[in-house]
Every structure is written in C-alpha cells, then in structure tokens.
Regions:
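N-terminal nucleotide-binding beta1-loop-alpha1 segment
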Residues: 2-22
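A short, N-terminal amphipathic alpha-helix
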Residues: 34-50
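Conserved core of the sugar-phosphate nucleotidyltransferase
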Residues: 83, 88-89, 101-104, 110-175
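Short internal beta-strands
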Residues: 36, 51-55, 137-139
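Conserved acidic residues
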Residues: 8-9, 49, 70, 103, ...
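Short phosphate-binding loop-to-helix
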Residues: 52, 58-106, 114-115, 122
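Structural beta-sheet core signal
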Residues: 10-12, 53, 107, 134-137
Length: 175
C-alpha cells in the first residue's frame, strides 16, 4: 500500500458573536464581506489541498459556501465564546476531520483583510524551510493585547508557533 501523501491544510476560525462589531466577519469592507477577502487570498495563493472554515454562524457558513471550501458543520457554542481558546477549536476540528499533526497545518486569521496571497505564500515557504510545526499568518503590527501578541514574531508580519509552545501561546480569544 503506497504511503498517504501529507496534506497542506489551512484552517480559519470565524466566530459569529463579535463583542465589538456585530457580524463583523460578514460586514462589507471596501465592497466585500471581511471573510470573503480572506478566503479569496487564501485560495489565490494556491498552496493548500484543503481549506477548512470553523464557525458557529449559519450566516458566515452560507457566505463562505460559494468558495467550495470545507465547512464541517457548525462548531459547538462552548468553543465559540469570547473567552474560548483557538487551540481547543483546532483540536475539535482536527479530531472531527481525522487530521493528524503530520500534515502541514496553517491557521490564517480571518478578520484581517490585509493578508494578501503573496504574504501567505512567503509565510508558507518559510514555514516549510524552517520545519515549523505550526504557522499563524497575520498582517497587523502587534502591540498590546492583540490576539497575535502572544505568538513569537520571527519576521515582520509573519508569526510562527513552535509545537512545544503551541498550547501555551494559543490561549487567545476566538476571531
């Protein structure tokens, strides 16, 4: 039996219940819903074998369906609060879809419309070159208590998580 090819997987966690801007992930930003901008750039990068959206919102899921990505049902409410940790959502999705850590897994924050496909490509190349176990891509400058401020910054605008630090550093609010 031939060895199974490892997959390149992109996971986007997209919560419906934003405390600051109601329905922010489906609000228009420069003419397009926020989630659409992220999905277009992820797909334009042509890196991933699978793009998976984890959400608790029917509206977000319906908005994303036209992109023919995987939406494995709505995630449980306990993984969708403002204090839920993304790492718990990742574990839930990986278990549900039988994804193991031998695959290349990249998490892209959906609520930043400035993540362009070239940044995703550049990030992925560095990710593979350095043999990191996980990657989080975000295009914002990090100051203060922003979600990505708990990740290591190795290069401007590109954030990596080492496997031995992932649990500790991934304890942040859902986006």
């Amino acid at each position: 039996m031939p060895a199974r090819r490892l997959e390149k997987i992109c996971l986007i966690c997209c919560r419906g219940g934003s405390k600051t801007i109601k329905n922010k992930n489906i609000k228009n930003f420069l003419g397009k819903p926020l989630i659409q901008r992220s999905l277009e750039n992820i797909l334009k990068s042509k890196i991933f074998d699978r793009v998976i959206l984890s959400t608790d919102s029917k509206k977000i899921a319906n908005n994303a369906k036209k992109f023919k990505i995987e939406i494995p049902g709505l995630r449980p409410k306990n993984l969708s609060t403002s204090t839920s940790h993304q790492f718990d959502t990742h574990k839930f999705i990986f278990k549900k879809l039988n994804i193991n850590d031998k695959n290349s897994i990249v998490c892209v924050y959906n609520n930043n419309p400035f993540i362009k496909s070239n940044l995703i490509k550049k990030s992925y190349k560095l990710f593979k070159k350095n043999k990191f176990k996980g990657l989080v891509v975000d295009a914002s400058k990090v100051d203060g208590d922003y979600i990505a401020s708990k990740q290591y910054k190795l290069e401007k605008k590109i954030f990596y998580l080492h496997r031995n630090k992932f649990l500790k550093l991934s304890l942040n609010r859902q986006t």
